[in-house]
Amino acid sequence: MVAGTRCLLVLLLPQVLLGGAAGLIPELGRKKFAAASSRPLSRPSEDVLSEFELRLLSMFGLKQRPTPSKDVVVPPYMLDLYRRHSGQPGAPAPDHRLERAASRANTVRSFHHEEAVEELPEMSGKTARRFFFNLSSVPSDEFLTSAELQIFREQIQEALGNSSFQHRINIYEIIKPAAANLKFPVTRLLDTRLVNQNTSQWESFDVTPAVMRWTTQGHTNHGFVVEVAHLEENPGVSKRHVRISRSLHQDEHSWSQIRPLLVTFGHDGKGHPLHKREKRQAKHKQRKRLKSSCKRHPLYVDFSDVGWNDWIVAPPGYHAFYCHGECPFPLADHLNSTNHAIVQTLVNSVNSKIPKACCVPTELSAISMLYLDENEKVVLKNYQDMVVEGCGCR
């Protein structure tokens, strides 16, 4: 969608919301907008409402308005990722591996594994479990750049102060699952790491080759095998170290904080990759502007006012701004005009049939949004041309 169309959608938003759009905007959101308005607005036609809904949902890459349940939990990993890329104070320190992955992607998706975890037959000194992530919600036109499997490992009390307590975690792709005539599945090693048991932390494993085969090459997704190779005499200690399944008495909230997570980084071809948003400094002009001249004006979009805060996790709203004002003859330097606008304004001064130059955005920037999609999956996406940074006569 071109920048002009997006700006038009922002300006049309209050009118369309007050008019209805029942399939997109909840009744509560429409009532809030209606109560805030001091003058009645005419109801747009159903065709206009339908077109607006289609364009807005298309801009967000959605086919229908998400209606997530209240039990959906946003992984802390995704919240930290959003804070980092939106430039929020107190965000976690940059992770170089993560920064490289995000530098080529404009969409990050997270997936929890299916709760039913299959424990595979034990081999000497090893514990292995199979688990599965449903990736059917990844759009077919999204180009995958990388994928990571996040697994939490807990500190073992017996290992405190002893750095020799180690084990190896191996991650395999299942090529062919176990069957009646096949005791163990056929697997391919994806990543491996030697870890200490005396600390609690997340471990990230590169599973890009497997996820690319499943999502873009048409191979069947049989899941992963997580194998813990015990390097000590007591394998029972290490077995509790890697958290793949929920404990019997563990509550849902605490389990959601350490539950295994598959994270995909992709690009839909519709903008720039994720980046840390830097606050821009206002450009001060020496020349005094007329109050009515073309300039940027405040416009804050509050998602809670329109009932979108049930599926948009962050931000709660954003400063979109808009451009408005006169482009008088002669056009001053501070109006950021093109040569064509100068010529058009000159012709308008002698022939009123030719319209004046218009006050429009000349520079736009992106925002990062964290939201729940139609499948209740948590998505972090970079949306282009959402914030007006500069205005001019064009």
From Swiss-Prot:
PROSITE patterns: TGF_BETA_1, TGF_BETA_2. InterPro entries: BMP2_TGF_beta-like, Cystine-knot_cytokine, TGF-b_C, TGF-b_propeptide, TGF-beta-rel, TGFb_CS. Keywords: Chondrogenesis, Cleavage on pair of basic residues, Cytokine, Developmental protein, Differentiation, Disulfide bond, Glycoprotein, Growth factor, Osteogenesis, Phosphoprotein, Secreted, Signal. Glycans are attached at N134, N162, N198, N336. GO terms for cellular component: BMP receptor complex; cell surface; cilium; enzyme activator complex; extracellular region; extracellular space; intracellular membrane-bounded organelle; nucleus. Residues 269-291 are annotated as: Disordered. Residues 1-19 form the signal peptide. Growth factor of the TGF-beta superfamily that plays essential roles in many developmental processes, including cardiogenesis, neurogenesis, and osteogenesis. Induces cartilage and bone formation. Initiates the canonical BMP signaling cascade by associating with type I receptor BMPR1A and type II receptor BMPR2. Once all three components are bound together in a complex at the cell surface, BMPR2 phosphorylates and activates BMPR1A. In turn, BMPR1A propagates signal by phosphorylating SMAD1/5/8 that travel to the nucleus and act as activators and repressors of transcription of target genes. This is Bone morphogenetic protein 2.
